[in-house]
């Protein structure tokens, strides 16, 4: 009887981790631009946005992710999610990013960034994260962000005070993400972003091999427009 009880206890612990996994695992592509709530910035947030220059301040120019939301929202870039018994692994094609997120509570949160590229460079702009399940929904909490931009097109900022939650679930065959940013120093109310993704038949993401970018093409286009 003791042996049966022991086996049952072990199964409750380990099988629970397996049973909590969902259909989130797979390779996904963004479906359209998504939606966002009204952006209500504090005076500090407004100042950062006003000072932002896309052609100078976009971290993408140096192959650096501006934020987690910026990477989720990149069109035509594969994203692979792998659910393990003790962690979530997310591979983003953009910038060859690899995100390792331990499963548990905030006691498993590391001071180090959760994301690195294939060369091993860590990116604090993506924060430090841990994850847990609520039913069929995967919840990712992220803290310890370096300054960056939630929206690079408009300079919507994040800061070391930023707290982010990603709620990820599959509905009707599509992956849905509700991404909530809270930061009292930057936002009067939380900023909520929503995206959907379609599953594709692929085993992995492609290699991006980023090199430092520039906006020369954009400047040339503007110069041509000005001369017309």
Q: Model regions: which residues?
A:
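Sec-dependent N-terminal signal peptides
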Residues: 6-10
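Low-complexity, intrinsically disordered segments with a bias for serine/threonine
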Residues: 12-13, 23
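N-terminal signal peptide c-region/cleavage motif recognized by signal peptidases
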Residues: 15-17
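Hydrophobic small-molecule pocket/channel-lining residues, especially in calycin-type beta-barrels
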Residues: 19-228
